[in-house]
Amino acid sequence: MNKKIIIFGGTGGLGSQLVSKLGAEGYTVKGLSSKDVDVTDYAQVEGVMQEHIPDIVINLAGANADSFLHKLSDTNNREAARKVMKVNTVGVVNVVAAALPHMRSNQYGRIILTSSVLTKKPVMGTGVYGSSKTFIKGLVMTCGLENASKNVTCNALQLGYFDGGLTHKIPDKVKTVIKDSIPAGRWGTIDELYNTVKFLIDTPYCNGTSIEVDGGIQ
């Protein structure tokens, strides 16, 4: 196989498990945390790309800070929201921009980003985070369009609530309400995340789209 993968956000609950499962498939996988590379700093991201020359880039890195929009008049809330937007938009653009040159040159590349179920079913207090994930849906459409002729695909995973990742930070009472709202009646699993990632790697005709992996939430 000999394909090299970089996973930004690859040391968290979901990321570390995805690193292990892809590694077991024969890929050479490097999982990076925010301490390893600041995705909002293009020079750092470009340095990682030049060092590893990945065939496949997966971005799980993200920031979240819930706040009602009317409370963004508070300086601290506004600063937290600014960080969310910077990591989830500028950071993602940096990852994509730094990955594309060598992928286009090699005539092979897979870029997989992460969006959110909040783009279709918003929750109060998540306006900034949800908006940042809506940005991802538009980005992959253009990226796929621009790079398909070079055998480079760009897609997004529009994720629901998984057993791991940000879900563990949700208060228990809220978790119960959320789980009851999921038609599947449960959290997503790492196997389901892995299977979707593997599908996107193996299916170049799937390009410029966001795949809903959310247990049927409408």
Feature locations, PLM:
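N-terminal Rossmann NAD(P)H-binding glycine-rich loop of SDR-like oxidoreductase domains
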Residues: 11, 15-20
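Active-site helix of classical SDR
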Residues: 96, 132
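Short, small/polar-rich loop/turn modules that mediate ligand/substrate recognition or access, typified
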Residues: 148-153, 206-208
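Alpha-helical segment proximal to the catalytic Tyr-Lys
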Residues: 101, 145-146
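Conserved mid-core segment of classical short-chain dehydrogenase/reductases
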Residues: 64-82, 125-128, 168-170
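C-terminal substrate-recognition "lid" of short-chain dehydrogenase/reductases
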Residues: 186-213
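Residue(s) in the substrate-gating loop at a strand-loop-helix junction
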Residues: 116
